[in-house]
Amino acid sequence: MLLWLGHLISHAGDAIYMIALPWLMLELTGSKSLTSFVATSAYLPAVFFGLIAGVIVDRYDRKRIMIISDIARALLVTVIPVAILFDFITPLLIGCVTFLLSSFATFFYPARDSLIPHITNPEELSSANSAITISGQMSHLLGPLFAGVGISIF
């Protein structure tokens, strides 16, 4: 239950920043090219680290990888509002934060997926996987909605 709730919150945050950071870049620069750069930097870590992430997850403590990844992502997300508050937000900072957020996610999700069978009874594995999948889909659906509401307010 705790893993599911954490996943729901984490996944919703991912969906929000996938909308909010490109929007912020567009607002900051007006450049469609730089906005595309931010969107691309969100997907590059899967290409660069996808295969090695699986190996690392198999060799090291999955729970620790998940915790480190989520703490790192939480800290990275705070960089953007702090940079805005102190007026040192730059396109490079937004791109780097986006890349790093996605990099940590590239390690988090395989760790989570491989941990589920170890913390779930075999007869509940299908239900656990279904709950994780459904919450992920709901987050992908609701995250952009929340991002849009947040953007319209600010």
Indicate where each model-derived feature is located.
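Alpha-helical transmembrane-bundle signature of multi-pass membrane transport and export proteins
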Residues: 1-154
